[in-house]
């Protein structure tokens, strides 16, 4: 629900963090009150943190500062589910997503806000302070987002972004238990801009976004928001069937023109390839229908709230 009193909602997914949150809140507060002169709310989403310190810390922040709202999920639903929870509770005309580890500079928020006439403004990091595996994953993920999700080719995606409330309200109507924020965004709008922002080294602890979670995020995009693999199987089936048909035609022509006998194993291989290709093609077609049916009837929630604390 959009509130006329709040201009910006800042959504921060939190997992096992506490050391960085006071500094993050203070810097965000200074940006909005001293530089932008805008009203804001700060929404922390505790995504099932394993640390027993995280929720009491967030609860304390929301009791101390009227701009802060803290929400605790029942378990770890993943970053995408946590973001959707934050979006559902946001009241601002513009929603900003930022990580909890201080690698994103709150001081760059005005750069995003300067382009808020666009539906989505995404921070493009000038120099990434990620390790090699994260940088590789980011490049691969960006390529697939362009090819599978319709992300404009000139746009680089990142977690640091500004989204107009109208866009958020539109994709919140799409109910899916395995959400991909990128898939939802690029389905709703193509009015997306990049702006250069800074990227800092992580000052506290280690990232909770492990290789396993990277793979799970990528798999969710691939399986739940795209029929790419099914189409790949179908195309492979067609190609194999076509190849086996050509092979059979060649053997048949040789038999008629030259009189070369067709070996038994050759005809067996040809028939096997043809049948196998047809089976793969059929599975792809059936799977295409199946995934559409599942997407239509699956209504499991993307997150479940345990408790909420407001200032």
Walk through the language-model features, giving the residues of each.
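Structured catalytic core of nucleotide-sugar glycosyltransferases
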Residues: 1-132
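Hydrophobic helical membrane-anchoring modules
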Residues: 1-6, 180-311
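Membrane-interface junctions
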Residues: 51, 76, 174-177, 224-228, ...
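Residues in soluble alpha-helical coiled-coils and helical-bundle/repeat scaffolds
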Residues: 15-19, 103, 172, 176, ...
């Amino acid at each position: 629900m959009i509130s006329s009193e709040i201009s910006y909602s800042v959504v921060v997914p939190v997992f096992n963090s506490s050391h960085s949150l006071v500094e993050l809140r203070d810097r965000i507060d200074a940006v909005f009150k001293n530089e932008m002169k805008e009203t804001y709310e700060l929404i922390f989403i505790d995504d099932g943190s394993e640390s027993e310190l995280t929720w009491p810390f967030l609860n304390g922040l929301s009791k101390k500062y009227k701009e802060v709202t803290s929400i605790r999920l029942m378990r770890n639903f993943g970053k995408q589910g946590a973001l959707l929870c934050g979006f559902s509770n946001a009241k601002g005309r513009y929603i900003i997503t930022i990580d909890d580890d201080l690698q994103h500079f709150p001081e760059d928020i005005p750069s995003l806000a300067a382009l808020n006439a666009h539906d989505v403004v995404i921070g493009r990091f000038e120099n990434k302070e990620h390790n090699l595996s994260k940088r590789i994953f980011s490049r691969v993920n960006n390529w697939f987002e362009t090819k599978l999700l319709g992300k404009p080719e000139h746009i680089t995606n990142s977690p640091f972004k500004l989204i107009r409330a109208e866009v958020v309200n539109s994709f919140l109507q799409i109910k899916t238990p395995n959400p991909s924020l990128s898939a939802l965004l690029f389905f709703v709008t193509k009015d997306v801009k990049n702006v250069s922002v800074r990227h800092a080294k992580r000052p506290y602890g280690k990232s909770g976004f492990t290789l396993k979670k990277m793979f799970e995020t990528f798999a969710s995009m691939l399986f739940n928001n795209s029929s790419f693999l099914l189409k790949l199987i179908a195309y492979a089936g067609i190609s194999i069937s076509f190849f086996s048909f050509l092979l059979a035609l060649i053997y048949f022509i040789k038999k008629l023109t030259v009189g070369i006998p067709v070996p038994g194993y050759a005809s067996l291989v040809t028939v096997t390839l043809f049948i196998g290709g047809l089976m793969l093609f059929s599975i792809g077609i059936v799977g295409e229908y199946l995934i559409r049916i599942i997407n239509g009837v699956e209504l499991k929630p993307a997150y479940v709230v345990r408790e909420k604390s407001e200032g």
